[in-house]
C-alpha cells in the first residue's frame, strides 16, 4: 500500500514510522514523509549507513504518525523496544494506536 505524504485537507506534511527487515532478520526503525521513496533509497544503498551491505531489505511495517515532533518521539520509543516487542508490533499483536496514544498524552 502506498501512502500519500500529505493530508488531503491540509498542506501539512504527514510523517510515517517504518521498520525495515534486513537479510539477517534485524529490524531497522526510521521516519519519513514518503515511505516508498525512502525505502527505494535504502535499497539503493543511499539511506542509513546501518542498512548498507545488509542484503535484501523488506519493508516490514509502516504507519502514519502525523507531526514531525511526534514521529521523532515515536521513533525513539520504538528503537528502545526489544526485538520481541518490535516483532509483535510488526505482526499487529501490539496495538500501534495504543503506543501512539501514550506518546500523545506525554
UniProtKB/Swiss-Prot annotation:
Organism listed in the record: Klebsiella pneumoniae subsp. pneumoniae (strain ATCC 700721 / MGH 78578)
* Domain GIY-YIG: from-to ranges: 13-88
Q: Which family does it belong to?
A: Belongs to the UPF0213 family.
**Descriptive protein name:** UPF0213 protein KPN78578_35340
